[in-house]
Amino acid sequence: MWLSDEFPRDLKTLRDRKPLVHHFMNFVVMNDAANVTLAIGASPIMAHAKEEVEELASKANALYINIGTLDEYWVESMIIAGKAASRNNVPILLDPVGAGATRYRTEVVKRILSETEVSVVKGNGGEMLALAGVTGGVKGVDSIVNATMDTAVKIAEEYGVTAVITGPWDYVSDGVRKVIVKNGTPLLQYVTGSGCMVGSVIASFMAINRDFVKASVEGLVAFEIAAEKAEAKSKAPGTFKQYLIDELFNLTGDDYVKMAKVEVVQ
């Protein structure tokens, strides 16, 4: 199994180091994102004030920019933080929430991509298709279409990033390497912000692993294995979310070896 040796080591490193992950997180999911970051072993900070984001982003081990809550103040803070992270070699994960739903959101995403050095872009099928120039795939912030590996490769090549497309299957590519993650459960679609939360876990692995394809796969598999284990304990979304956080906290390297469904595409 790909990463079966590396994942246990990286999970231990993550929990030993407790890296700082600076979040720009939307109001809807902020508490849950902080909790999953803590559960996997990293240290979250949710800070958005222009007066401090440059300092915090410079000191962080990873920066996660989630555009779910947008106004001009937040956008300027995101740009300030992104530039500071770029200057200090801090990896940036961008979640283009709702890209394609409005012109404003799409323009903000492209501005962040042009003015900062984003390492990973993670979104659902509709959002990522919008970045690839295909419209009509987003309703609100939800995807109404599926994207494919070809979309991930196109985005990776166009923007110089690792692209992560989440869905029933997850597609990860840096334009050269291509990986499909097949873990997960349909229950995740009934938990608001599950995609935002998986971004927190990916960013946590990015903080200790600068191979961003591997870090993205590690984060996806960790979150989705925890979701599968949570589903075994609850079939309803409220308690499922509670168990999801517990299972992230209890996750082991052996869980990856036993449960990961990862396909490297040749």
UniProtKB/Swiss-Prot annotation:
Its EC number is 2.7.1.50. Keywords: ATP-binding, Kinase, Magnesium, Metal-binding, Nucleotide-binding, Thiamine biosynthesis, Transferase. This is Hydroxyethylthiazole kinase. HAMAP family: Thz_kinase. The keyword Kinase applies. Catalyzes the phosphorylation of the hydroxyl group of 4-methyl-5-beta-hydroxyethylthiazole (THZ). Substrate binds at residues 46, 193. Belongs to the Thz kinase family. The gene is thiM.
